Structures are given as C-alpha cells and as structure tokens.
C-alpha cells in the first residue's frame, strides 16, 4: 500500500526564506557585525594587532586579554577610535530562528484552540488544592502504566469546551520555570488566600504575567476562613498593578473555597469568557510549532517529553527540532495515557522517541525532511558550542582578574526543568570571595561520566532526586569526590551557603568593650609589673586586647596576659570592680595610665 501523502503545510520554506546570515566584515569604511566578539576576532577583521587593543585598554586601567568578549558599546568605541563607522545587523540563524520567524496562515484555515491556563500563587494559598479539585484526582500519584507524571499539565472539558492547565511549581526557587510557563500561557489564574492576602510569590506571579502580557483571573481562595480581609486583599492587589473589574478595571475576580469545591464553575465560566475575548486560533493544516513543558529520562520508555503544540498538528512519525538536536516522534500519549496518532494546538501530550531530553521552555518545530532537520539541529549545536566557548573564555578572563576562589558544582536531577531551576538558584549563591560555577547540569542517575567530569574539573556533585548506586558511591569515595543528594531544593541552598561560608576567609574588626584606670603598680620579681586597676566602663576579659594611654597618648598596644581579682585568676571583670592586670611583654606602666579594652568580633 502506498504511503499516504502528508498534506500539511511545511515549515521549511518559511524558515529558509527568513534566515538572515550576517557576514562580519569591514566594508567601505563600515564595520558590520551581528553579535559580540573577542578582541582577537575584532582586531583580525580590521587588520590591526590585537595586542595594540589590549594595550589601549591597559592604559585605561582595564586588564583585558585577547579573549575578552567586547560588548556592542566597546566595539562601537573601537570603530570610532580607528576611524570606522559601524552597523549592527540582526542575524536570524539556526540558533534563534524560532524566536524571529513569522509563520503566516490563511484565515480560512484557522480553527479555535483550547486556552492554556497557568495557576500561580503564594505557597500555602491553596493552589495545589485547587488543582486537585479541578483534576478530581491526586496530582502527586504515580500512574501504573510505567510513565510517571511530573508535568502538572492536564486538560478538562467544561461546557463542551476544552481547557488546558499548566501547573508551575509554587516556590520562588522555581522563578525561571514559572517565567517559562508564562510564555506559553494564555491566561493566568492567580490564587490568593482570603485570610493572608498578597505575598511575595503573589507579586512575583503578577510580575511574570504582566511581563508576558498575559491576562489574569484572580481566584480568592479560603473564603470559608473567618479571618478573611477582602478590603485589604483588594487594596494590595491594586497596589500590585491588578485592576479589578469590581473597581472598574478589566481583571475578573472569583471567590471560593478550593477545599469545598466552591467557586470552581464560576472560575471555568470566566476562563471560557476570557478565551472568547482572546480569540485563540491555530492552523491544523501545517506541521507543528510548540513548546517543551518538561522532559525526563524514564526507565521504562527512555526520553519522555511533555509538549504543547501552539500551531499546526503533531503527528506520530514527525521529525522535531528542539534545541541543538532533533528526533522522531515514535509515540504520542495524552495526559490520561491514551495513545494518539496526532494532536492539535493547546493540548498537552507526552512524546516518546526523541532520544534526548530537551530543556523545559525550549521551542520546537516540526520538519517534514529529516536531512533538513539534521542540518538545522547541527547548526544550532555548532552555534551553542561557540556561545559556550565564548562564555567559558570570558569566565576564565574574569577569574584571572578578580582572583576569587572557585567552587565547581555538577547537578543531576530527575527532570531537566528542575535541573535548570536548581542551576539558576545555585548561581545566585555567591559573595565577594567565592565564585560558584555550574560545570554541568542534567538528568538521570549519577554515573561514571559525572565522576570523570568531577575529577577533571575538581567539582562536587549535587543530586536532586538522583542518587548514585553503591558502586558509583564507592568509586567517588576512592577518588575523594563529594556527592550529596537532596529531595528538597532549599536544603541544597542551606548546604551550599554553609559550605561557602566555611570557604570564606573570616574577617574581624576590633571594638572597644571597656575602659579602666591604673590606680597603683605592683612589682613582682617573678612576673614583673602588675597593674592594680579600676574598671570604669564595660568589662575586660582574660584574653582581651588592651591599649595603654599616658596623658592621652597611645604608648602600647598589646594583650592581657593574666587577669586577677584578689589572689584568684578570673576570666572576666565587670564595671565598678578593682582588679589586677598583667600586660603581655610590657612593664612600662604607671599610675593614672588609661587602659582601653578591645575585643575582636567576626564580621
């Protein structure tokens, strides 16, 4: 039987016609470029010595090397200095075409697609309870089919209309993942507890939605709580930039109780109404374009990727380019584990067969030509390698300049999205003396490759829901490679903060803690002069530092050797008491000398 002809509109022609390659060159006195470059590369293009440029920066007090990456402003300054004009041209290539190419569809080919909803809110405001109530199932359960759900992507039907929900993690540690969620989202449901009001994560969710220009529906949860304060809540929402319909704005507000199932239908009604206003369309007659929601390596099926098609139709057997690689879709399942032959826009599905785990938030494109899919993915891989090389080169240059201590980390997690979120979180843990470098991050169990990389890069391995087997653990111990596994993200943060603090050279400052006056000097042949003193202010300890002043002039800066009260050695003397004091290696004390008592404090 002849293979059925694929009548879907190909994406290839629009990609080929809109790709713009910019040649970096000096042409007719104008330096044309599209992206940052190193001093060495710039010097080569304008035919001068790179060392000359390095010297120019040195005279300005900047210690650059030939591998320093020049910013657009620095390139412009160098062009003017050497007598050239410049022009920055936007390049559309394999690495960025999905963000820049426009795919045009005929109006008569368009159909309505389901709205994609992201539920956001502060921790403990009832977001998970609302999700559970909407799904009418326990979100944390693991299905028995061999495919475990980690996506929080699901679809319901209300009033004969499909609604797709994305659940983004509720902790601010996952800001990056939540921001990605906003990019594929049509409507945000903002869950706010009636008895707690607007909190930091509420404001963060509002900021993400507004930055992505996504409309918001507010769901006021826990209306059954007697301590609710709706006036304060609405005022706080207004201050945070939410213009409620009740106050003449355009943001709907729904009141309810997720626990009791109250307000859910009203919420669905508002979603469908908002979706009608948005007039969400897609062309089912073209090859797919969409976004990766999550990906992981599943023991039973290999690579398991959750995607949402944003335009076109995804078919079993399609070639997808996502990130620097491509793969063929061997199977498609909906979120109820039902196998599908194809899926349109707005419906979350599991895809099997990509043989790799693309990053969460990565855009994908369906290509009906394997050779071209391979070409695109290879070009993207080459571009990413070049970008990574430039970043590493710049990092090495910065390290030389700032002379910081380096703490290298390798991250292994159960999902790609979580690994990236942890990476972003870890990179925020730094100070003036320690630079944290994430050498590598990925998914799966901790293995031999991780040990090899850790050994060559002097890295520590951090696992999240990822542990080494006993053999790998023993090898790590033999190689003196540290592995720490966690199941709570913020335990990683606490651990790393503690470790970094131990790496920092402690800093101290001296503070005055007391003042005393020498009343009389006693001489003992075995020890030398002992000062008989009165503690006038504060206190003195047996290990305190002491400054000796005579007629307001500092004559000695030393340390207490012995501290006595009567015949007994003591550790501390308080204000108002007389005491005996021996200053280490100093005998030139006299009556009426003033003592300033100093203590070192760690800062």
From Swiss-Prot:
Residues 121-128 are annotated as: G1. Residues 112-279 form the tr-type G domain. Residues 257-259 are annotated as: G5. It comes from the Bacteria. Residues 146-150 are annotated as: G2. The keyword Protein biosynthesis applies. Its main location: cytoplasm. Gene3D superfamilies: P-loop containing nucleotide triphosphate hydrolases, Translation factors, Translation initiation factor IF- 2, domain 3. The keyword Coiled coil does not apply. GTP binds at residues 121-128, 167-171, 221-224. GO terms for molecular function: GTP binding; GTPase activity; translation initiation factor activity. GO terms for cellular component: cytosol. Keywords: Cytoplasm, GTP-binding, Initiation factor, Nucleotide-binding, Protein biosynthesis. Belongs to the TRAFAC class translation factor GTPase superfamily. Classic translation factor GTPase family. IF-2 subfamily. PANTHER family: TR-TYPE G DOMAIN-CONTAINING PROTEIN (PTHR43381:SF5), TRANSLATION INITIATION FACTOR IF-2-RELATED (PTHR43381). One of the essential components for the initiation of protein synthesis. Protects formylmethionyl-tRNA from spontaneous hydrolysis and promotes its binding to the 30S ribosomal subunits. Also involved in the hydrolysis of GTP during the formation of the 70S ribosomal complex. This is Translation initiation factor IF-2.
């Amino acid at each position: 039987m002849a293979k059925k002809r694929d009548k879907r509109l190909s994406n290839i022609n629009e990609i080929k016609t809109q790709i713009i390659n910019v040649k970096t060159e000096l042409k007719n006195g104008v330096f044309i470029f599209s992206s940052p470059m190193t001093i060495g590369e710039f010097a080569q293009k304008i035919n001068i010595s790179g060392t000359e440029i390095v010297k120019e920066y040195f005279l300005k007090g900047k210690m650059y090397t030939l591998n320093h990456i020049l910013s657009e402003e620095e390139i412009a300054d160098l062009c003017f200095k050497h007598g050239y004009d410049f022009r920055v041209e936007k390049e559309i290539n394999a690495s960025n075409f999905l963000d820049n190419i426009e795919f045009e569809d005929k109006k008569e080919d368009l159909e309505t697609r389901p709205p994609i909803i992201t539920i956001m809110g502060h921790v403990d405001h009832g977001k998970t309870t609302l999700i559970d109530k909407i799904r009418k199932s326990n979100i944390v359960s693991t299905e028995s089919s061999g495919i475990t759900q980690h996506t929080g992507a699901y679809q319901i039907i209300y009033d004969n209309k499909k609604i797709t929900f994305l659940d983004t993690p509720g902790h601010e540690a996952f800001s990056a993942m939540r921001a990605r969620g906003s990019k594929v989202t049509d409507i945000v449901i903002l869950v706010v507890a009636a008895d707690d009001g607007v909190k930091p994560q509420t404001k963060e969710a509002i900021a993400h939605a507004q930055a992505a220009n996504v409309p918001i529906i507010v769901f006021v949860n826990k209306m059954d709580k007697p301590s609710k304060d709706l006036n304060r809540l609405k005022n706080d929402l207004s201050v945070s930039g939410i213009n409620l319909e009740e106050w003449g704005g355009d943001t709907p507000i729904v009141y309810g109780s997720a626990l009791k199932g109250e307000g859910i239908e009203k919420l669905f009604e508002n979603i469908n109404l908002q979706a009608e206003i948005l007039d969400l369309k897609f062309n089912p007659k073209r090859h797919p374009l969409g976004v990766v929601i999550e990906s992981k390596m599943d023991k039973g099926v290999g690579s398991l990727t959750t995607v949402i098609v944003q335009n076109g139709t995804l078919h079993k057997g399609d070639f997808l380019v996502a990130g620097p690689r491509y793969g063929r879709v061997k199977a498609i399942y909906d979120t109820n584990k039902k196998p599908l032959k194809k899926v349109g826009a707005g419906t979350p599905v599991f895809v099997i067969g990509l043989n790799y785990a693309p990053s969460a938030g990565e855009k994908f494109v369906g290509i009906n030509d394997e050779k071209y899919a391979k070409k695109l993915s290879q070009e993207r891989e080459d571009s990413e390698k070049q970008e990574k090389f430039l970043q590493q080169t710049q990092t090495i240059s910065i390290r030389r300049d700032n002379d910081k201590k380096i703490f290298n980390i390798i991250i292994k997690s159960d999902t790609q999205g979580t690994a990236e979120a942890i990476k972003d979180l870890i990179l925020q843990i730094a100070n003036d003396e320690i630079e944290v470098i994430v050498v590598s991050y990925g998914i799966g169990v901790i293995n031999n490759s991780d040990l090899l990389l850790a050994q060559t890069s002097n890295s520590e391995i951090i696992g999240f829901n990822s542990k080494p087997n006993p053999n790998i653990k023993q090898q790590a111990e033999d190689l003196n490679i540290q592995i720490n596994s966690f199941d709570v993200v913020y335990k990683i943060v606490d651990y790393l903060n503690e470790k970094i603090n131990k790496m920092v050279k402690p800093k101290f400052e001296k503070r005055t803690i007391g003042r005393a006056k020498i009343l009389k000097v006693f001489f003992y042949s075995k020890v030398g002069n002992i000062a008989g003193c009165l503690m006038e202010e504060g206190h003195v300890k047996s290990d305190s530092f002491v400054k000796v002043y005579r007629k307001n002039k500092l004559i000695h800066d030393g340390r207490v050797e012995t501290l006595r009260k009567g015949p007994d050695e003591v550790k501390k003397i308080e204000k108002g008491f007389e005491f005996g004091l021996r200053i280490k290696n100093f005998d030139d004390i006299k009556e009426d000398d003033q003592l300033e008592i100093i203590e070192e404090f760690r800062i």
